[in-house]
Amino acid sequence: MVDKRESYTKEDLLASGRGELFGAKGPQLPAPNMLMMDRVVKMTETGGNYDKGYVEAELDINPDLWFFGCHFIGDPVMPGCLGLDAMWQLVGFYLGWLGGEGKGRALGVGEVKFTGQVLPTAKKVTYRIHFKRIVNRRLIMGLADGEVLVDGRLIYTASDLKVGLFQDTSSF
């Protein structure tokens, strides 16, 4: 039985990383340090820009986050690829929330644009995922557009984020 709520705490997300939230066959989020959100504040099967599902999640920013110490020394900034990965993580999480089973794998993205950055002085990153399509056949796949905001200001956009759930990844 899927634990299907509208919001999830950090402990819930950590449970997902241990395979405890969506069951033994459900997709898992990564563990820290690669878990790129602290909470999911909204999940719906409708809504979003296409009325086919919406996820909103947040990451609290503080200067002690691991990536600020190495990217870059003297010029700390959150790597843009981590924001992109967070959006893929949320697409996979949504597929598990819908009851999908398998191991989540990012399959691609149409276009990514960066128009800002996350500095250690920021307070909060918000991720917004707008689902366009869910394929539920032999392969379960989510297709969505995403946005990353820092302290309420839009800084990244991604179109056609794709994540699939695989029963067997040995030949992937």
Swiss-Prot record:
Q: Name one GO molecular function term.
A: trans-2-decenoyl-acyl-carrier-protein isomerase activity
Q: Where is the signal peptide?
A: none
Listed under GO cellular component are: cytoplasm
Q: Where in the cell is it found?
A: Cytoplasm
Residues annotated as catalytic: H71
Look up the EC number in the record and give it: 4.2.1.59, 5.3.3.14
Q: Which reaction(s) does its UniProt entry say it catalyses?
A: a (3R)-hydroxyacyl-[ACP] = a (2E)-enoyl-[ACP] + H2O; (3R)-hydroxydecanoyl-[ACP] = (2E)-decenoyl-[ACP] + H2O; (2E)-decenoyl-[ACP] = (3Z)-decenoyl-[ACP]
Keywords carried by this UniProt record: Cytoplasm, Fatty acid biosynthesis, Fatty acid metabolism, Isomerase, Lipid biosynthesis, Lipid metabolism, Lyase
Biological processes per GO annotation = unsaturated fatty acid biosynthetic process
Q: How does it assemble?
A: Homodimer.
The UniProt entry, under NCBIfam families, shows: fabA, PRK05174.1
Q: Which family does it belong to?
A: Belongs to the thioester dehydratase family. FabA subfamily.
Protein name (Swiss-Prot/TrEMBL): 3-hydroxydecanoyl-[acyl-carrier-protein] dehydratase
Gene for this protein? fabA
